[in-house]
Swiss-Prot record:
Enzyme class: isomerase
Residues forming coiled coils: none
SUPFAM superfamilies tied to this protein: Aspartate/glutamate racemase (SSF53681)
Name of the protein in question: Glutamate racemase
Binding-site list for substrate: 7-8, 39-40, 71-72, 180-181
Length: 265
């Protein structure tokens, strides 16, 4: 079985790294929609169209299962498009909500504007723990910082402090990284939070559930190949991905095929 992962850019590599750690024998195709980065400022209709195009392309590549390594797509597109495909399609919201709700009662979520506006995390967490209080904060400057390789320094601390201030004021006990780009900023974010706050990385939660659902052979130590594709500049993506993968990936640019007429509406 080939697993498809996709994100708008580098964020999904946090999911890929977790797969390499937990499921090293799992073959993966990773697609980064870098030509349309970031997704967080897109409309729900745009995001659903992009996701349909990616899933259609994954089908053509022989992918049997897809994990949306993007919270925005998981929040806005997964409930709409998953049933349209024979692929098994999963996302990040539900696993992260389950992880947050296990112990958290005052839960902060930092995410893209589109994810926050969907209130997907609030609904998912409160469906599990109705008494939980959830505060969601949009952090639109985080993705450009990560994609630009700016992960430390006073600029990053200043931006993070501004986003986290209302959550610290609410005395949260749990923080969900509601975008796969945000764990790259964990050293700064963690330094600005009280030591008692537990951070939830959706990549860890989602891959743990994926590992439990796959046959034991996928958990062997043999390393499977990962093939990388982008809609934008492959050289730029490879250079940006190198520090996080510890190797220089071979990346191929692709043009996503047009959707079948029945899916263009």
């Amino acid at each position: 079985m080939v697993l498809g992962l996709f994100d708008s850019g580098l964020g999904g590599l946090t999911v890929l790294r977790e797969i390499a750690r937990r499921l090293p024998a799992q073959p993966v195709i990773y697609f980064a929609d870098t030509a349309r980065l970031p997704y967080g400022s897109r409309t729900p209709a745009e995001i659903c169209r992009y996701v349909r195009e990616i899933l259609h392309w994954f089908e053509q590549q022989g992918v049997q299962r897809v994990l949306m390594a993007c919270n925005t797509s998981s929040a806005l597109a997964l409930p709409v498009v998953a049933s349209e495909y024979a692929l098994k399609v999963g996302g990040l919201i539900a696993p992260a909500a389950r992880a947050a709700a296990r112990r958290g009662r005052r839960i902060g979520v930092i995410a893209t504007a589109a994810t926050v506006q969907s209130h997907a995390y609030t609904r998912a967490i409160q469906a599990l723990t109705p008494r939980a209080q959830v505060w969601e904060v949009a952090c639109p400057e985080f993705v450009p910082l990560v994609e630009g390789g700016r992960l430390l320094g006073e600029e990053v601390r200043s931006v993070a402090r501004r986003y986290l201030a209302p959550l610290v004021e609410q005395r949260i006990d749990t923080l969900v990284y509601g975008c796969t780009h945000y764990p790259y900023l964990a050293p700064v974010i963690g330094d600005l939070l009280p030591a008692s706050v537990r951070c939830v990385d959706p990549a860890v939660a989602a891959v743990a559930e994926l590992a439990a659902a796959l046959p034991p052979s996928r958990r062997l130590e043999t390393r499977a190949a990962c093939h990388f594709f982008v809609s934008g500049d492959p050289v730029r993506f490879a250079q940006a991905a190198y520090p996080w993968l510890d190797y220089y990936p071979q990346v191929q640019a692709v043009a996503l095929p047009p959707l079948p007429a029945a899916q263009t509406n």
